[in-house]
Amino acid sequence: TGNLGEASIGLNLLKQKKQNLKSAEKICLKRFLKPEINFLFSQDLSKIANSCIDISDGLMADLNHICEQSNLKAEINLDNVPLIGNPITAITWGDDYQLCFTIGSSKLKKLVEISKKHKIKITNIGKLNKGKGISVLSKGKKINIKKAGYNHFNG
């Protein structure tokens, strides 16, 4: 759901103590300082999703939890990920309080209804296959991601 990268930009703006923010910068700062969680959307989504996780520790780190628990490999198309700023930072940084979920194709119509009802932006960024881990593709080529996201034990 939503855009990735806004919170990391918001944190950088806060660190820089930047004044006279543009409207897009104000949104990023708000995403970092006062993230919004749509509980009603989450409740409706829980009725049709196969799995779901908030990606507050970063898309890569949290999607990996889904992969480990389902014994499947995720393939992300980076070109489809709605993001702001540096693409690698956007998918590895935390604090974007968005959801990553999996859903069967038979539930897509219901998903569209739910997203419209709650005015939540949803995007198909990839798929699950047999295997382990996560591969990230950009323009059809696999790219290497060194940092996976926030780790509560290592920081």
Residue spans for each PLM region:
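Helix-biased detector of long, well-ordered alpha-helical tracts
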Residues: 1-155
